[in-house]
Amino acid sequence: MGCIKSKENKSPAIKYRPENTPEPVSTSVSHYGAEPTTVSPCPSSSAKGTAVNFSSLSMTPFGGSSGVTPFGGASSSFSVVPSSYPAGLTGGVTIFVALYDYEARTTEDLSFKKGERFQIINNTEGDWWEARSIATGKNGYIPSNYVAPADSIQAEEWYFGKMGRKDAERLLLNPGNQRGIFLVRESETTKGAYSLSIRDWDEIRGDNVKHYKIRKLDNGGYYITTRAQFDTLQKLVKHYTEHADGLCHKLTTVCPTVKPQTQGLAKDAWEIPRESLRLEVKLGQGCFGEVWMGTWNGTTKVAIKTLKPGTMMPEAFLQEAQIMKKLRHDKLVPLYAVVSEEPIYIVTEFMSKGSLLDFLKEGDGKYLKLPQLVDMAAQIADGMAYIERMNYIHRDLRAANILVGENLVCKIADFGLARLIEDNEYTARQGAKFPIKWTAPEAALYGRFTIKSDVWSFGILQTELVTKGRVPYPGMVNREVLEQVERGYRMPCPQGCPESLHELMNLCWKKDPDERPTFEYIQSFLEDYFTATEPQYQPGENL
């Protein structure tokens, strides 16, 4: 179809840090090549980074690679996720403290430094609050997920809020972190309790993470073991920084944090003027448009997807985008803003390592071992489990539509738009631009897209991971794939793939959609793949 793909070099840029807030970041649509500067070796890989082979990339609509990838997704219903501190719910607290530095993006924003204190004037907007800096006396808007009530547990550097066990392990096990590094988070299993997660080391397991449940007393105190009780969490943490006292290791330093993404670019920056965007480096080109690295308002680095006129109706796109921006999860790429008149522009978070497919084939991903690959699959399942809970549908789940950031963080992109495409070679479902090899048979043949057809696609995506980006059904053309799958053919276990993972793939490929597992089950299976026989929480010595 004359679709071409170009890709630039890449380098580290935006890092991930889960927020201190009830629900993580926003949602989106986007895939593209990596940042055009230097190649940075993947810390988790066993070999050094390599140069990108730009000549071996194939066609995609928006610069992923391998085959055609439009964008993907459709919606039915959804639930609105509350922001960090929903309007009117600051509990009477008016003094908040900054958790991170922030550089103003507009004339209405306030720049501030970590530790700066604010009086909150108006928090009815949810994501962006009007505040007055106590230090400077200036008024302006601040991102609500960058602040916490002064002198609260949320303002403590070691408190990471609502974070799962697996995400805690990912952060603590990042390269460069030492034994004893720690964080405190909400308990996943016990309401009102907390968990202390510590990086440890032993001869059998090497680097690992231990989790200790912090329980709450009826009188408001806290303890890990009843023989050592504390009035506050702060006192508990201080005690264990001075003595291991039964833990695997005394607490040394707080786990490093990275600024979270703001919810949107700025207050009221949703439908933005085209002139506010500067397209700087073209990252990819495909059948339906281009992807650029650029800058918004001269201040903020973003990814910009430009759609060819006629790809979809602007009114339908804007309606779908309104739904997509309300979906927020730290494994979904946040949708920042749109230019809603043709040519449509879609503005999203920039992810430094580009698409998962390119990362596996041409980047540091080709050196990854099974534990890292399974963890990436678990992250994707985490994001899809959220989409499942929100009664949303992706429609085009594949490695080319997953973006990779620093430290192997994966985020789902390009959902919510596939059903809006008006190209005949795509809407025919068996046309040249339709991703047959990733699509469940009931969706390809009859247009029955559901979360269960997404589960089928996830099974195909798993083969992309373990084969480092190999095209599914090697040696077979689209029509042959459709015929053979209908007759019961399923891909054999890829070389080097454990049979237990192949069994999960086959569950995803059940002919009856109702027999396929939920993403909640898949996430749990993958997160516990290497640790299923270990206790979730450590009792500690003499505890």
Curated annotation (Swiss-Prot):
GO terms for biological process: cell differentiation; cell surface receptor protein tyrosine kinase signaling pathway; cellular response to platelet-derived growth factor stimulus; cellular response to retinoic acid; cellular response to transforming growth factor beta stimulus; ephrin receptor signaling pathway; Fc-gamma receptor signaling pathway involved in phagocytosis; leukocyte migration. It catalyses: L-tyrosyl-[protein] + ATP = O-phospho-L-tyrosyl-[protein] + ADP + H(+). It is found in: Cell membrane; Cytoplasm, Cytoskeleton, Microtubule organizing center, Centrosome; Cytoplasm, Cytosol; Cell junction. ATP binds at L283, G284, Q285, G286, C287, F288, G289, E290, V291, K305. The modification Phosphothreonine is found at T21. Residues 91-152 form the SH3 domain. Residues 158-255 form the SH2 domain. Residues 1-20 have a biased composition (Basic and acidic residues). The modification Phosphotyrosine is found at Y32, Y336, Y345, Y426, Y446, Y537. A lipid is attached at G2 (N-myristoyl glycine). Its EC number is 2.7.10.2. The active site is at D396 (proton acceptor). InterPro entries: Kinase-like_dom_sf, Non-receptor_tyrosine_kinases, Prot_kinase_dom, Protein_kinase_ATP_BS, Ser-Thr/Tyr_kinase_cat_dom, SH2, SH2_dom_sf, SH3-like_dom_sf. The keyword Glycosyltransferase does not apply. The keyword Acyltransferase does not apply. The modification Phosphoserine is found at S40. Residues 277-530 form the Protein kinase domain. Signal peptide: none annotated. Expressed in the epithelial cells of renal proximal tubules and stomach as well as hematopoietic cells in the bone marrow and spleen in the fetal tissues. In adult, expressed in epithelial cells of the renal proximal tubules and present in keratinocytes in the basal epidermal layer of epidermis. Its main location: membrane. Phosphorylated. Phosphorylation by CSK on the C-terminal tail maintains the enzyme in an inactive state. Autophosphorylation at Tyr-426 maintains enzyme activity by blocking CSK-mediated inhibition. Palmitoylation at Cys-3 promotes membrane localization. Interacts with YAP1 and CSF1R. Interacts with CTNND1; this interaction allows YES1-mediated activation of FYN and FER and subsequent phosphorylation of CTNND1. Interacts with FASLG. Interacts with IL6ST/gp130. Interacts with SCRIB, when YES1 is in a closed conformation; the interaction facilitates YES1 autophosphorylation. Belongs to the protein kinase superfamily. Tyr protein kinase family. SRC subfamily. Non-receptor protein tyrosine kinase that is involved in the regulation of cell growth and survival, apoptosis, cell-cell adhesion, cytoskeleton remodeling, and differentiation. Stimulation by receptor tyrosine kinases (RTKs) including EGFR, PDGFR, CSF1R and FGFR leads to recruitment of YES1 to the phosphorylated receptor, and activation and phosphorylation of downstream substrates. Upon EGFR activation, promotes the phosphorylation of PARD3 to favor epithelial tight junction assembly. This is Tyrosine-protein kinase Yes.
